[in-house]
Structures are given as C-alpha cells and as structure tokens.
C-alpha cells in the first residue's frame, strides 16, 4: 500500500537510515522501500494485515514474492551504478493491526 510504505519509511529514518525510494517500480515489479543503512542497501517489503484471518503479515512474503523482490533489487543495483558486491539485505516490515515488526535480513538474495 502506497501510504503505508511512505509512512513506514519513517521507521528507518528514526534508526538513522537514509530512505532512497518508496514504491520503486521497474519492469520486474516493485519494492516498497529502498533505504541505506551505512554502506548497506536495504530492500524492504511492507505487509499489512488488519486481522489474522488471512494469516499474519510476515507470512505473506512467500518464495515467489521473494524472487520477484530480488529481481527488482538486482535491476535497481545495476541501473544505479552499483553491482552484486554492493552490501544489501532484504527486510520485511510487517504490520498486524497496530503492531509493527521490522525483520532485518528476512530472506537471502541468492535465490
């Protein structure tokens, strides 16, 4: 969700990160937040669940979604003068009702 990811970028800002992009899109898909933590580029998926009837927010980032995020991230790196040796990680910000959980290194980028 556009508004959720823009507002949740503040979670990173409060931790001293620089938010590089919100709702970044390319031909491979979208990444909700791209931020920089020191030298590390953080690619973050935001998931929101109002109730647990469809499962918790963290459970919504399955293998196929991870692969898509990785493809978008690789293209981002390539088109921004970066390469595969650039330190990066994949995070998930999960919002269940009013509970916000930041899961750093939620999955590996080698899939």
Q: Where do the PLM segments sit?
A:
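Single conserved hydrophobic/aromatic residue that forms the stacking wall/gate
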Residues: 1-9
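A short acidic/basic microdomain associated with nuclease active sites
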Residues: 13-27
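A generic beta-sheet turn/junction motif
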Residues: 26-28, 37-39, 96
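Structural motif
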Residues: 28, 41-43, 87, 100
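Conserved catalytic cores of phosphodiester-cleaving nucleases, focusing on short active-site segments
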Residues: 31-57, 69
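Mid-chain, well-packed structural core segment of small domains
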Residues: 53-82
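Domain-level recognition of nuclease-like catalytic cores that cleave nucleotide substrates
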Residues: 79-111
């Amino acid at each position: 969700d556009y508004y959720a990811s823009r507002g949740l970028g503040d979670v990173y800002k409060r931790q001293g990160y620089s938010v590089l992009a919100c709702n970044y899109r390319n031909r491979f898909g979208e990444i909700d937040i791209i931020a920089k933590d020191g030298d590390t580029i953080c690619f973050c998926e935001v998931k929101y669940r109002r109730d647990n009837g469809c499962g918790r927010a963290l459970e919504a980032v399955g293998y196929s979604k991870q692969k898509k995020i990785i493809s978008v991230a690789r293209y981002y790196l390539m088109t921004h003068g970066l390469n595969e040796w650039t330190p990066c990680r994949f995070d998930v910000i999960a919002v269940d009702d009013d509970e916000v959980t930041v899961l750093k290194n939620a999955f590996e980028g080698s899939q």
